[in-house]
Amino acid sequence: MLRLKCASQRYDWGKVGVNSIVYKLQVASENPDISHVDLPYAELWMGTHPSGSSCLWDNPHVTLAAHIQENPASLGKPSLIYFGRRLPFLFKVLSVAKALSIQAHPDKKMAVRLHAEQPDLYKDGSHKPEMAIALTDFEALLGFRPLNQILAFIQAFPELAELTTLELPSPEEKRDVQPPSIKQLYSNLMRSSPEKVESTIKSLLNRFTTGSKSVCDPPLSILGVDLQEEDVQALVDLFLRLTQAFPGDVGCLSIFFLNYIRLKSGEAIFLKANTPHAYLSGDCVECMANSDNVVRAGLTPKFKDVERLLEMLDYTPLTDSLRLGATQPIPTPEGISMKSFIPPVSEFAVDVIQFDAESRGFSLPSVPTASILLFLHGQGTITCPSTGEACSQETKFGPGFVYFVPADMIVNLVSKEDRKGSLHAFRAYVNRK
């Protein structure tokens, strides 16, 4: 078992300094690379991706990727057979102050094609399904709304009709016409000229801020859509925030096409390949296939690959529960909980371990593949009963400590008796047995 020194990413959408959980974890773990308190700290990366590879704490010149190449058995047989001599997931902590781009991650077939055609933009040929577990109140856009909701918004906000080139019947008309597809409507929106987009945004801003019109005309209730008034008002508030941060950006209008979801701490979402999404605010733990491929089309000053995004998106509306449920893999003593978030992919799964303030110890069951163990809160020591000795020279844990745990290793967590508060840890591992 090896302690890791992990990289931070300072994207401009991240929270700044002490407001960022990424910064606070790095400082608490005594990472010597963290010195600038006035910079954004957006992401903590734990894994082997070359854009931010972890290295060994006691020997920072050795990357985790190099260690795995020298010690492939540490990955475990199921992982070696399925993925070879590499760690197939990337584990992260995100601290979001400003909305990330409207984006999607390609499936394997598209990823190979993108990497072959534009390797400078798309760095690898891997797909990138991902999962986010909220640490604080967390906002996101995720997948397309049902078509009837999208059509209702277009009818309630006629300003959108011109961009989608949808000819709307009056409420008195009854026409037996085939409704347009989500792909047709969203493609028309995203291909609109910047001038038309800016004009539509200004018109909606006028509608939402002057009070001269009702917010929805006609009201959504007349249109037979199951959306509450508070849901519409939340969207209006989001629109006002986004237009301040990204004036004139077509992504501001995507909120009427995509599901707006607000997570509480401990709730999770799963994003399969080709699903449009954007993280808007809050803190989360994220796990994904080991790729950094992103196709963007809105809410960003970066390159927008609109045609590519429209080609690859999955336009199937997400009408089931948008949250990923958790299971409890083993019984736990009173005051201790362990939940597992198991997505429908092989690259990763995540356990969440929590002690209350009175609990002292817990034996974390082994998994047959390598794992990365992150401590968010709590202090104590780690021992490995398989050897009867300490796991390594450095066996303490505290906030921000990260460990690489070889396959099949049982880990005993012993909390410090005089610690303040509870223990909160996350374990990511390969979802193969």
Swiss-Prot record:
Q: Name one GO biological process term.
A: carbohydrate metabolic process
According to UniProt, this protein's pathway is:
Nucleotide-sugar biosynthesis; GDP-alpha-D-mannose biosynthesis; alpha-D-mannose 1-phosphate from D-fructose 6-phosphate: step 1/2
Q: Where in the cell is it found?
A: Cytoplasm
Where primarily located? cytoplasm
Is Cytoplasm given among the entry's keywords?
yes
Cofactor names from the entry are:
Zn(2+)
Question: What is the name listed in the Swiss-Prot or TrEMBL entry for this protein?
Answer: Probable mannose-6-phosphate isomerase
What is the source species?
Echinococcus multilocularis
